Amino acid sequence: MLDRLQIIKQKFDEISDLIIQPDVIADQKRYVALNQEYKGLKSLVEKRDEYVILMANIEEANEIIADGSDADMVEMAKMQLEEAKERLPELEEEIKFLLIPKDAEDAKNVMVEIRAGTGGDEASIFAGDLFRMYTKYCENRGWRTSVVDMNEGTSGGFKEVIFEVTGEDVYGTLKFEAGVHRVQRVPQTETQGRVHTSAATVMVLPEAEEFDVQIDMNDVRVDFFCSSGPGGQSVNTTKSAVRLTHIPTGLVAQCQDQKSQHKNKDKAFGVLRSRLYEQELAKKQADDAVKRTSQVSSGDRSAKIRTYNYSQGRVTDHRIGLDVFDMDGVMNGKIQKFVDELQLVNNMEKLKESEIF
């Protein structure tokens, strides 16, 4: 293990030197990529340094005990050895998890799409609840959110809402939220007090850079239209909203959130690029799924992943059998418990595959 950690330390030292070079700082794309790699290796190198010191302490303590000439030193060495041996398995476990290979997309920003499914107006209201849940979670994480496009429901919420999330390790954190979310509750419009079941689909797309996906402009039809608000009323009289249609795939992306046609077009291209990138990832994930059965796959958008049962105050994640009895907290963005448990299961699966130890 130490040999592998030494290679990582050398790589870390190289990056540390590179990120202070003027030519690297001037190249923002390269600087950002190297800085992310630096942050990813920093904690591992710190653990490596602790491991080296710990192994040296164990060796020193064993030598003192073997010598046995100084009784006081032997007692101190025994205490040092006991402490080191107690810490060693914990440290090895921490290093083991840090050595698990991360997905290349984990550091990327994301586009989140929430669409109302079965359940009519109640499904739109639930989609709005999920939107608020995620934006509050993002706010607590210090991430920025920006609405790209929305289609509001007739009784509140959204038939569809697309928003961008920017920050650190966004995709790696949110990717397991993709899938079908189901709600069981009495709708506000229900007069008989009957519980209804509705659903909304969440998609989490890693934001693609221009070098990730090449789009031939000849393959894209661009339409301009007047942006509209709730109920379809016109927000402005200029055709500032933009709709893009990728002819080879039939994928459509639009944006009407910005006042400027140019900004709407840029954002719409961002959505289109991410959708095309997600298609490529979905194919890769499908190939990976043939090789292994993952409990927490982030690729199947049709899988029912979570149920929000209001009458019982219970939120259940069906992939890992986790129940959380804090409906108010969850709907106000307290979903870290789900994030942590899903990442843990995913890491355990990767650990079995990677054969690090």
Curated annotation (Swiss-Prot):
Its main location: cytoplasm. Keywords: Cytoplasm, Methylation, Protein biosynthesis. The modification N5-methylglutamine is found at Q233. One of its GO terms (cellular component) is cytoplasm. GO terms for molecular function: translation release factor activity, codon specific. SUPFAM superfamilies: Release factor. Pfam families: PCRF, RF-1. Gene3D superfamilies: 3.30.160.20, 3.30.70.1660, 6.10.140.1950. It is found in: Cytoplasm. Methylated by PrmC. Methylation increases the termination efficiency of RF1. Disulfide bonds: none annotated. The keyword Cytoplasm applies. NCBIfam families: prfA, PRK00591.1. Peptide chain release factor 1 directs the termination of translation in response to the peptide chain termination codons UAG and UAA. PANTHER family: LD18447P. HAMAP family: Rel_fac_1. Belongs to the prokaryotic/mitochondrial release factor family. This is Peptide chain release factor 1. It comes from Flavobacterium psychrophilum (strain ATCC 49511 / DSM 21280 / CIP 103535 / JIP02/86).
